[in-house]
Amino acid sequence: YIPRKIMSFKEFMDNFTKGMQQMITSGCILMLAWTIGGVCRDLLSTPVFVKTFIETTGLPGALLPALVFILAAFLSFSTGTSWGTFGILIPIIIPVAQSICPELLLSSLAATLAGSVFGDHCSPISDTTILSSAGAGVNHLTHVSTQMIYALTVAGCSLIGYLIIGITNGNLLLSLGTSIFILCIFCLLYTSDAADDMQ
């Protein structure tokens, strides 16, 4: 900016200082989030807990995709990372699914990915959430709470889909169709409520 004479050196330094002041809060939140995620992952032995929980529940195989979705969401929300949850759960889920119900292996892997991304999206300690709120210039917790409504709606529809795919032993069309149908009902209810509020 200075060589092209878009701004003077004083303007550049003033803007640089203002920009750094805006990023200090985000940087501190990000460092604390990484610390909390590391504590959950390493000191609290969350991966060991998840593996033991899956192997010892004794639940029927039909509930495996839904259970994996919930566990992935919980783990990702707790640690603030979807990729870390992939790395923790995928090596655990593959042998567990093959031993309990091999037909649901792909559904269980899909549930792992979807639950991890959902948990990461809703987590207040996720780096993507922190940087998104900082980039948009909004309060961090306000950003989390406004995103939660939409994410929980889609997660609820997905959970129903994973229950159906487990019960029907892998019927993808019925599961996907039911999830989309329920999501459409939510959208219709929401738009009708919004239209009533505007009148």
Regions found by a protein language model. Give the residues of each.
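Hydrophobic alpha-helical transmembrane segments
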Residues: 63-67, 109, 173-177
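Hydrophobic alpha-helical transmembrane segments of multi-pass integral membrane proteins
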Residues: 27-33, 58-96, 100, 112-120
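Short helical (or helix-break) motifs at transmembrane helix termini and adjacent helical loops
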Residues: 116-131
